[in-house]
């Protein structure tokens, strides 16, 4: 998801695997601008209309390297927010070209939905989900503006989104209730009702995009469920703009299926670190370097009994 981008991402891996830059070239041709240049120079990387296609392409480049090295296909795929698109590409539901065009548009619509400086997001730590929801409802009812739980990332870690004044009010209340509050450096309040106008326009683009049923089950952000038809894929991608990311439930679903190994295709290791906190996850691997890719590959092959 957004926030994991960094200037120069995948540069070292690109020197070792030609498929990395080839993937960026394929995606760049679809959107009409140079995604690899943005990733390496940082020019425009903080603008969501560029951030989103760059990150999606980086995730798919890592996925392709994983397969190139002989990595096994997972039982399930899931992606956090923007990452749901990467998961759908990996599952053959969306083409890479269509996906990068969609998320480029998604970024533009999200940015235009809320005037610059009006929206905000913050991470609330150390309070349970119900406490955070109650604080959001309290502030919203006092006419301080709209604020909602946007991302349920883990136990004791909820991200809120909404109007700036309301976000600041919830942050203050969280601290009064022995929680921590950290403002996030974003200009767009994702996954809240302020994004409904963007979602309505985005739904039209989704209707015109070829989408297949995923060949590998993709756990959706909204509801933490598996789509059983293409209409549900479209509906979930539309609703995802203004409804909460249910990552805690997603990871619980994975554990309930008996999954013990998790691999993260994207720059950084935020999701792998969240997975490591879960009792039934034996190992969680980030795949953003050759050594990490090889470590994950060997561990999973050993676990499956394919190598000793």
Model-derived regions, located:
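FabD-like malonyl-/acyl-CoA
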Residues: 2-133, 137, 184, 261-291
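Alpha/beta catalytic cores of group-transfer enzymes, especially the acyltransferase/condensing modules
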Residues: 3-4, 29-31, 91-243
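Structured loop/turn residues at beta-strand edges in well-structured enzyme cores
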Residues: 72, 213-214, 257
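Conserved functional loop/turn residues at catalytic and ligand-binding sites
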Residues: 81, 210, 258
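Generic hydrophobic alpha-helical scaffold/packing signal
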Residues: 171, 219, 238, 251-255, ...
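A short, acidic, amphipathic alpha-helical segment used as a generic capping/interface helix at domain edges
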Residues: 242-259
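Short, flexible loop segments at boundaries between secondary-structure elements
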Residues: 283-307
């Amino acid at each position: 998801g957004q926030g994991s981008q960094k200037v120069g991402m995948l540069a070292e891996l690109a020197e070792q695997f030609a498929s990395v830059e080839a993937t960026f070239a394929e995606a760049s041709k679809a959107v009409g601008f140079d995604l690899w240049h943005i990733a390496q120079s940082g020019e425009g990387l903080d603008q969501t209309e560029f951030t989103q296609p760059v990150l999606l392409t980086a995730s798919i480049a890592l996925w392709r390297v994983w397969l190139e090295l002989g990595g096994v296909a997972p039982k399930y795929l899931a992606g956090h927010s923007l990452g749901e698109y990467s998961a759908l590409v990996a599952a053959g539901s969306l083409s890479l070209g269509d996906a990068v065009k969609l998320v480029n548009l998604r970024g533009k619509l999200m940015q235009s939905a809320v005037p610059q400086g009006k929206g905000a997001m913050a991470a609330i730590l150390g309070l349970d989900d119900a406490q955070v929801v109650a604080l959001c409802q309290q502030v919203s009812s006092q006419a301080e503006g709209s604020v909602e739980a946007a991302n349920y990332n883990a136990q004791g870690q909820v991200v809120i989104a909404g109007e700036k004044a309301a976000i600041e009010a919830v942050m203050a209340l969280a601290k009064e209730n022995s929680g921590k509050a950290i403002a996030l450096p974003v200009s767009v309040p994702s996954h809240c009702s302020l994004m409904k106008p963007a979602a309505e326009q985005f739904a039209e683009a989704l209707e015109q995009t070829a989408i297949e049923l995923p060949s590998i089950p993709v756990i959706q952000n909204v509801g933490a469920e598996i789509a059983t038809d293409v209409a549900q894929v479209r509906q979930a991608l539309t609703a995802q703009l203004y409804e909460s990311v249910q990552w805690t439930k997603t990871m619980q679903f994975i554990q309930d299926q008996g999954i013990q190994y998790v691999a993260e295709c994207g720059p950084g290791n935020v999701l792998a670190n969240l997975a490591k906190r879960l009792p039934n996850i034996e190992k969680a691997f980030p795949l953003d370097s050759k050594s990490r890719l090889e470590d994950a590959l060997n561990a999973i092959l050993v676990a499956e009994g394919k190598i000793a």
